[in-house]
Swiss-Prot record:
Primary location group: membrane
Record's keyword terms, sorted: Cell outer membrane, Membrane, Signal, Transmembrane, Transmembrane beta strand
Name listed for the protein in its UniProt record: Surface lipoprotein assembly modifier
Top-level taxon in the UniProt lineage: Bacteria
Any one Gene Ontology cellular component term annotated for this protein: cell outer membrane
Family designation: Belongs to the Slam family.
UniProt-annotated stretches for the region C-terminal probable beta barrel: 198-486
Annotated membrane topology: Multi-pass membrane protein
């Protein structure tokens, strides 16, 4: 160093070449976004140390393209600093970001997006992963289309052991990467995530305001001398949780334990309070692209009894069954998820509902890009009960679309149509045949969180048409939902 001034091999440091680049083409707020950019560089393993965030190899630059500048000299070239910072951010180059950020801050004009991105990388390198992830989510609320940004967020989530969130980001990233070498890197991350043996939790809360809890038809509906029940309303909340843990074995095999639970509580109509808990465990096989599992389960349901019940929940029914699940990535943009379930039901009081059931579900997902998904699914459900007028067969078609928009807005739209046919006539002499429709629209902002919980606003509409007048109804509701995966 001459006169205490550090000399910087600038282009060597950030792995760039100025040959063929025109500095006059820099736009202050615009960043070029090639589909794969520098993501074709690879890492050796998904099991990286936390100090190796910027370990992706850079291309060798011939010596004739290296320019040595001091910091003071570099500070005289704001366009060069800007170009270097942008590419350092894209390349996930921590050393270059930490060098250029102080220089960039000295300039009279700053781009907040670039500053926040640089802060995210710096916080990550300092080991403050929680703050780094917060910065990345703030950036995602502004622009969810930048692939290097998604990769860096996925990395930070991975090293912070937010496994489920990291897996979602890597799977989205996989849909937009064409380079086979980098696809292999993503698959290594996914395989490592699948093999991690820690508990994963998903929790959520909905605020309920249902003006037709008992799915009553229009008031005054009659069939002969029979009169339909009247509507009942209720305000309250619904809570649900999913918890699971895997224990990896050799050769891609694993064992799994899972708990699912949900409950509804209406403070002004407690007769409709209910809760369900399912416990299961079994064996499975997984790679980065395929997961198959088979597990028996036991389920218990508590219910206050509905219109003829009390304000206290009591044990209502038990189920014992077995479930087979399969998830398979057919290609980088197509995934199929299938489930088969068989169970036997036993009711504490309503013995005429005892029996067994079969359930088959298959869903095909299409992810054309990381900010969008579509799905189509079909279900078959057969319920066999001792009283044949309660036994039925149902076929369901499901459609869905999810989208990350500009300005941090995300949306999800789902639609389903079901055809339900009962086996025998009821007491009135009608063999019930229903057509059931449901649609839900959900909106949320990607950068709005409260204690790690993301609020989502949903509108839900349900309609049932039937040859049985007592089972014709429609209702809609708007509710707030909050949830978290950790």
């Amino acid at each position: 160093m001459k006169n205490g001034v550090k000399q910087i091999s600038f282009l060597s440091l950030i792995g760039l070449s100025l040959i063929g680049l025109s500095l006059t083409n820099i736009a202050w707020a615009k960043v070029a976004r090639p589909k794969n950019d520098t993501l074709t560089n690879t890492i050796q393993s998904a099991e990286l140390k936390t100090s190796s965030f910027s370990s992706m190899p850079k291309k060798e630059i011939p010596n004739r393209h290296i320019i040595s500048l001091s910091k003071s000299q570099l500070a005289q070239h704001p366009r060069l600093v800007l170009r270097g910072l942008i590419l350092a951010l894209y390349q996930n180059n921590t050393q270059a970001v930490q060098l250029l950020l102080p220089l960039y801050k000295q300039f009279p004009q700053h781009d907040n997006f670039l500053l926040t991105w640089a802060k995210a990388i710096d916080a990550r390198e300092q080991g403050d992963l929680t703050q780094s992830i917060a910065y990345y989510r703030e950036l995602f609320a502004l622009d969810a289309s930048l692939l290097p940004l998604r990769y860096q967020l996925a990395q930070a989530l991975f090293f912070n052991y937010e496994n489920e969130s990291a897996k979602i980001q890597f799977e989205k990233l996989r849909t937009e990467v064409d380079d086979e070498k980098f696809l292999g890197v993503i698959d290594q991350y996914l395989l490592t995530l699948n093999q991690r043996n820690q508990w994963i939790w998903q929790v959520g809360l909905n605020f309920l305001n249902d003006d037709n809890l008992n799915n009553a038809p229009k008031s005054g509906t009659k069939i002969g001398s029979w009169t339909a029940w009247e509507k009942e309303s209720g305000k309250g909340g619904r809570v649900f949780f999913i918890s699971r843990k895997k224990w990896p074995w050799a050769d891609h095999f694993f064992s799994k334990t899972m708990f699912n639970g949900n409950g509804k509580y209406y403070w002004d109509n407690k007769k409709y309070n209910e809760a369900t808990l399912r416990i299961g465990g079994g064996l499975g096989y997984q790679t980065a692209l395929v997961e198959v599992s088979l597990f028996p389960f036991q389920e218990k349901r508590w219910y206050a009894g509905g219109s003829s019940g009390t304000n206290t929940m009591k044990q209502y029914a038990d189920k014992l069954g077995i479930r087979l699940e399969n998830v398979d990535w057919l290609s980088k943009t197509w995934q199929i998820s299938t489930a088969l379930e068989y169970g036997e039901s036993r009711y504490k009081i309503r013995k005429h509902l005892d029996g067994n059931y079969y359930f088959i579900s298959s869903t095909l997902f299409y992810l054309p890009k990381s900010t969008q998904f579509w799905f189509v699914g079909m279900d078959f459900h057969r319920e066999n009960t001792q009283a044949l007028d309660n036994a039925y067969q149902q076929k369901t078609l499901r459609l869905g679309w999810g989208q990350d928009w500009s300005y941090g807005i995300s949306s999800r739209l789902t639609f389903s149509y079901a055809n339900r046919v009962y086996r025998e006539k009821d007491l009135i002499g009608i063999q019930q045949k229903n057509r059931e429709y449901a649609t839900t629209i959900t909106l949320w902002h990607r950068n709005i969180h409260f204690m790690g919980l993301t609020p989502k606003l949903s509108w839900d509409y349900q309609k049932s048409t039937s040859n049985h007048a007592f089972y014709r109804y429609d209702k809609n509701r708007i509710y707030l939902e909050i949830g978290k995966i950790f």
